[in-house]
C-alpha cells in the first residue's frame, strides 16, 4: 500500500492556495474556520525578555498594530504564495506600496528607470514628488530594450514597469527587462495590479519585487483601499553591492543587517521595521479581512472578467464608430502578439482603452450616455466601469506624456465587469446610438 502524502508535502494549485494559505487549520483559539479580525492596537509580552526579543527581531511575533496584525499576516502569507514570493507586506494603499518600495531602494542622489506607460499617479510620484527628496527618474520606452539599458546609470537602483501598461494594457517583456536589470545588479520591480497572479506571476520571469493595488482585482468589489509588496527572495542584495541600507548595520535599528537577520524576507522586513514604523501607512485588520475574502474568489472573478472583456474587445473592434481598440488580443504589432501569447495564454486585460471616432466631446458624450457602466476613478470592480483618462486619471500629465502613454482626447478607458455579457454590450450599443 502506498504511503499517504501529508498535506504539508502536497503541491496545491492556485485555486486551492487562494483559499487556504496562512490558515491551514482553524483558528487555534476559537476554532473559527474563517480568519478572525484581530481588532487590537497592541499585544501583551510574557515578560521583559520576551519583549526585548520581539523588538530585536529575534522573535518574529507581534509588537504593535502599526507594524503587524494576525489578520494581516494571513493576507500577506496568502498573496506571497499566490505570487510565488518569499514574503509580503500589506499597507494602506497601492500608492503606499509603490512609494515604500522606491524609498526602500533609493536614497538621496539615486536614480530609477521607469516605463513611460505606467499609472499616472506613479508617474507623478517619480517625476514630481520624489525629486524633492533627491531621487530622480528617467522614463523610457519599455519596448525599446536598448533605450532601457542605456538609461541605467551607476546610481540607478531599480527598473520599474507594469505587467500591463496603464491604460492601454500593452504587454511588456518581463523576462527581457529582468535580464537587463540583473546585468546591472539592480532589481526589477513590477506592478502586477492589472494582471493579477492568476494570469501571470512576474517572479517566474525574473521580477524581484511585485507590487499591487489590492483595491483592484484582489478586493474586487470596490469597497476597500489597500496595497501589497511581495519580495521574490531571489535577488542577492549583498552581491549587488548597491544596497547598504539592507546589507550593512542599520543605525536606526540597533545595528541590524536586514539581509543577515532576515534572509529572503530582508526587503519587506526593512520596510516594516523602518518605513512603516516611521511613516505609518498601515493596513487595518478589517481591510485585510476583506482582501482575504476577495482572494478566495480571485480566480473565478478574473476568468469571468477576461471572458467578458474579450467579447467586448471584439464587439468594439468591429464597430463602425470605433477608431481603434487598444488590447493585446487585437494588437496589430507582431511583437505584442508574441508577448501576449507568452505571458497571457489564458487571456488578459479586462482594463483597456479605445478611441471613438470624433473629438474629446464625442468621447465624453458617449460616456455620459452609458447607464450600466459607472463613471468613477477605479478599475477591476465586478461592476463595469468607464472613465475619460485625459481629463481625469492622467489629467496632470503634459501633452507629451499623454502621447507617450497612448492617451488621446477621444480615448475612453473601460474596465469590464462580471455582468452578463449581453447586458454589457447592449449598454455600449445604446451609448453609440445616442452619439452617432
Where are these regions (language model features)?
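Positively charged, small/polar-rich N-terminal and surface patches that mediate targeting and assembly
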Residues: 7-21, 70, 230, 380-381, ...
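Short amphipathic alpha-helical segments
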Residues: 60, 86, 287, 291, ...
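N-terminal glycine-rich, Lys/His-bearing helix-loop that initiates the first secondary-structure elements
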Residues: 1-59
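Conserved PLP-enzyme active-site core in the AAT-like
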Residues: 2-10, 22, 26, 87-318
Amino acid at each position: 500500500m502506498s504511503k499517504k502524502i501529508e498535506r504539508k508535502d502536497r503541491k496545491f494549485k492556485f485555486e486551492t492556495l487562494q483559499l487556504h494559505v496562512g490558515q491551514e487549520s482553524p483558528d487555534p483559539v476559537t476554532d473559527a474556520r474563517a480568519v478572525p479580525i484581530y481588532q487590537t492596537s497592541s499585544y501583551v509580552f510574557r515578560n521583559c525578555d520576551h519583549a526585548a526579543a520581539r523588538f530585536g527581531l529575534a522573535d518574529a511575533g507581534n509588537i504593535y498594530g502599526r507594524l503587524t496584525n494576525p489578520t494581516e499576516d494571513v493576507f500577506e502569507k496568502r498573496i506571497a504564495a499566490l505570487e510565488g514570493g518569499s514574503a509580503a507586506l500589506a499597507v494602506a494603499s497601492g500608492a503606499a506600496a509603490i512609494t515604500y518600495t522606491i524609498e526602500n531602494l533609493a536614497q538621496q542622489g539615486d536614480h530609477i528607470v521607469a516605463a513611460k506607460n505606467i499609472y499616472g499617479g506613479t508617474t507623478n510620484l517619480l517625476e514630481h514628488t520624489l525629486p524633492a527628496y533627491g531621487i530622480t527618474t528617467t522614463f523610457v520606452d519599455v519596448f525599446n530594450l536598448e533605450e532601457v539599458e542605456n538609461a541605467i546609470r551607476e546610481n540607478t537602483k531599480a527598473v520599474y514597469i507594469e505587467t500591463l501598461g496603464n491604460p492601454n494594457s500593452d504587454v511588456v517583456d518581463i523576462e527581457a527587462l529582468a535580464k537587463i536589470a540583473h546585468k546591472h545588479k539592480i532589481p526589477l520591480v513590477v506592478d502586477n495590479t492589472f494582471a493579477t497572479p492568476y494570469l501571470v506571476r512576474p517572479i517566474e520571469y525574473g521580477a524581484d519585487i511585485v507590487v499591487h493595488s489590492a483595491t483592484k482585482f484582489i478586493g474586487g468589489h470596490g469597497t476597500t483601499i489597500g496595497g501589497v509588496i511581495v519580495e521574490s527572495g531571489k535577488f542577492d542584495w549583498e552581491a549587488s553591492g548597491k544596497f547598504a541600507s539592507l546589507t550593512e548595520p542599520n543605525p536606526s535599528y540597533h545595528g541590524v543587517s536586514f539581509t543577515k537577520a532576515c534572509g529572503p524576507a530582508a526587503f519587506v522586513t526593512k520596510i516594516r521595521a523602518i518605513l512603516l514604523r516611521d511613516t505609518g501607512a498601515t493596513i487595518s485588520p478589517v481591510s485585510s479581512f476583506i482582501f482575504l475574502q476577495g482572494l478566495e474568489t480571485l480566480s473565478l472573478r478574473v476568468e469571468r472578467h477576461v471572458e467578458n472583456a474579450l467579447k467586448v474587445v471584439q464587439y468594439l473592434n468591429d464597430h463602425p464608430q470605433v477608431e481603434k481598440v487598444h488590447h493585446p488580443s487585437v494588437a496589430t504589432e507582431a511583437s505584442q502578439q508574441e508577448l501576449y501569447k507568452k505571458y497571457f495564454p489564458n487571456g488578459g486585460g479586462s482594463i483597456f482603452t479605445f478611441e471613438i471616432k470624433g473629438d474629446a466631446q464625442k468621447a465624453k458624450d458617449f460616456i455620459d450616455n452609458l447607464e450600466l457602466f459607472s463613471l468613477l476613478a477605479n478599475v477591476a470592480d465586478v461592476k463595469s466601469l468607464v472613465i475619460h483618462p485625459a481629463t481625469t486619471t492622467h489629467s496632470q500629465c503634459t501633452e507629451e506624456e499623454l502621447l507617450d502613454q497612448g492617451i488621446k482626447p477621444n480615448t475612453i478607458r473601460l474596465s469590464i465587469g462580471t455582468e452578463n455579457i449581453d447586458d454589457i454590450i447592449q449598454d455600449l450599443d445604446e451609448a453609440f446610438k445616442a452619439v452617432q
